[in-house]
């Protein structure tokens, strides 16, 4: 069948339309490029069975429909904790009204010094919309096991000095509106990059 014949031209037009349809289909299924580490496949986020400053238990299940950022630290942290929350403050400002669909959660892993009220005051120093959580030592340890994370007091075992540092995770965990753990944000991302990831999940 000559390519210039009516049948040949019709065949080529059908082929081009088919290819165009496939391109549109694949484009519609494309996933956004993220700046954070993608957790694939995503898993349901572990529970945060901890207490807020009002004495109520904080439940991730109650945050459905929102993107939730979770960071584990402590209020006496000299470096990455204030840096992370300051970045969050900039992210919230950059998101504008979209920040209403985001929950920023600071979890203290130093319950000996950080009560829920102390954790909340610390988080609110950066932005009144931020949530600070803590709990008993048993609650914190159980939560860390669920998240498969570790945090421990630095120094000599048994040391009871009131001034100490705590080794803890440095990454931020990002949970999508369906409650799935989707991303990890490592140190070094800019507020603009963090905001872009949040917008891609909203």
Region roles according to the model:
Residues 139-197:
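Thiol/disulfide oxidoreductase modules built on the thioredoxin-like
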Residues 45-46, 68, 169-170:
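Short loop/turn microsegments at loop-to-beta-strand junctions
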Residues 48-68, 92:
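A short beta-strand-turn-helix
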Residues 26-28:
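C-terminal motif of bacterial Sec signal peptides marking the signal peptidase cleavage site
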Residues 61-84, 88:
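Short active-site neighborhood of thiol/selenol oxidoreductases, capturing the structured segment around
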Residues 30-32:
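Bacterial signal peptide processing site
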Residues 4-17:
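Bacterial N-terminal signal peptides that target proteins for export
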Residues 83-143:
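Structural microenvironment flanking redox-active thiols in thiol-disulfide oxidoreductases
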């Amino acid at each position: 069948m000559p390519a210039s014949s009516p049948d040949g031209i019709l065949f080529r037009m059908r082929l081009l339309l088919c290819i165009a349809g496939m391109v549109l289909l694949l484009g519609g299924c494309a996933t956004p490029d993220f700046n954070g580490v993608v957790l694939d496949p995503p898993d349901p986020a572990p529970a945060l069975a901890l207490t807020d400053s009002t004495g109520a238990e904080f439940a991730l299940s109650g945050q459905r429909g929102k993107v939730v950022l979770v960071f584990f630290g402590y209020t006496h942290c000299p470096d990455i904790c204030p840096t992370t929350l300051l970045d969050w403050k900039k992210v919230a400002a950059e998101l504008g009204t979209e920040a209403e669909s985001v929950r920023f959660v600071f979890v203290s892993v130093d319950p000996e010094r950080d009560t829920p009220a102390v954790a909340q005051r610390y988080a609110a120093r950066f932005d009144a919309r931020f949530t600070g959580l803590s709990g008993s030592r048993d609650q914190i340890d159980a939560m860390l096991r669920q998240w498969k994370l570790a945090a421990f007091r630095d120094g000599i075992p048994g040391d009871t000095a009131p001034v100490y540092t705590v080794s803890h995770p440095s990454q931020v965990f990002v949970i999508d509106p369906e409650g799935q753990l989707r991303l990890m944000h490592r140190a070094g991302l800019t507020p603009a990059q963090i905001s872009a990831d949040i917008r891609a999940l909203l």
